[in-house]
Amino acid sequence: MSKVQLYGTPMRGGCCGGCECPNCGFKLGGVVAGVLAGGKVSKRRKSVAKKGGIGTKGGAKKSPWVAFLQRYSKEHGVKYSEAMQSPKAKKEYSALKKSGKIHKVGGSKSSGHRKTKKPKKSMKGGSKTKKLSEKQLMKELLAM
């Protein structure tokens, strides 16, 4: 066997050029065995890029409660931690929430409006409209 070149670099540790000893590594589909898993670079390529959140350009989205507390603490001259504990802030937030001025961001998938899926057309049976028209034709033929 010939030495395998991977990424333009010769294979290391070969003792006699064509052997299959454990020190040399052996050919496996044109790639040296043991390299199939890939390194950090290939794993980085495979990973999915973040679309949002911490560590991205857009940053993490603030919850409406956090945004309200920050605004409340600036307006009333109170620390953020005190605003979190104040019952007045909680009452004001719940009133704004009920009036619809504060919208919920994200949320769970179970709540809210769901789109209904359209039924898939069957390839075997044909369309339902065709079957209905056939039934009507049969009724007309029997009526004659």
From Swiss-Prot:
Region (Disordered): 90-144
Ranges annotated as biased composition (Basic residues): 98-130
Name of the protein: Uncharacterized protein V1
Species of the source: Sputnik virophage
